[in-house]
Amino acid sequence: MGKYMKKSKITGDISVMEVSKATAPSPGVRTRAAKTLALKRLNSSAADSALPNDSSCYLQLRSRRLEKPSSLIEPKQPPRVHRSGIKESGSRSRVDSVNSVPVAQSSNEDECFDNFVSVQVSCGENSLGFESRHSTRESTPCNFVEDMEIMVTPGSSTRSMCRATKEYTREQDNVIPTTSEMEEFFAYAEQQQQRLFMEKYNFDIVNDIPLSGRYEWVQVKP
């Protein structure tokens, strides 16, 4: 094993290092732990030799090239503010705020006044409409008008009321019996009363004639 040489290459402008084992054979057998330790030492020595002397902006680690970010950051200079400018701006802002307050209040007052006027106008219109409808209802009752179709009413409510009253009167006309039906009804009752009177007092009230029976009728002359 001492005849072979181990070579380690690193990409870039790095010199190749050749490491050979010691000529004098070490007594005993090299263990695996000792072998790994020797490899670690070899790699660390190669990395130390690979580092450049001057500070460049690139770092070379194994097979990757990393770019070093620039550490020079321009410090932010605080803005220079004069005390007089601060005082003047503060006074101006105060004056502007003081002057702007009554303008906002006046605009709010104008809006409130406009809303109040619009509410009053809308309420007045509603009251006028209600009074006109109320006057039409009171001045034109449907019970005293014979033909409501000839009249022209401003509101639809009066028309609906007139239609309802017409339908109600028609229903009442249909319910009321005719004269012939009333005569038939009372004729039957009169016949019953006449029959009972004739049986009790033996007198015919229709023909004004006395009948034979328990009572004796005498004609009285004036």
UniProtKB/Swiss-Prot annotation:
Specifically interacts with CDKA-1, but not with CDKB1-1. It is found in: Nucleus, Nucleoplasm. GO terms for biological process: regulation of cell cycle. Gene3D superfamilies: p27. The lineage of its organism: Eukaryota, Viridiplantae, Streptophyta, Embryophyta, Tracheophyta. Residues 68-101 are annotated as: Disordered. The keyword Transcription regulation does not apply. One of its GO terms (cellular component) is nucleoplasm. Coiled coil: none annotated. Belongs to the CDI family. ICK/KRP subfamily. Keywords: Cell cycle, Nucleus, Protein kinase inhibitor. It comes from Arabidopsis thaliana (Mouse-ear cress). Binds and inhibits CYCD2-1/CDKA-1 complex kinase activity. May target specifically CDKA-1. This is Cyclin-dependent kinase inhibitor 3. The keyword Cell cycle applies.
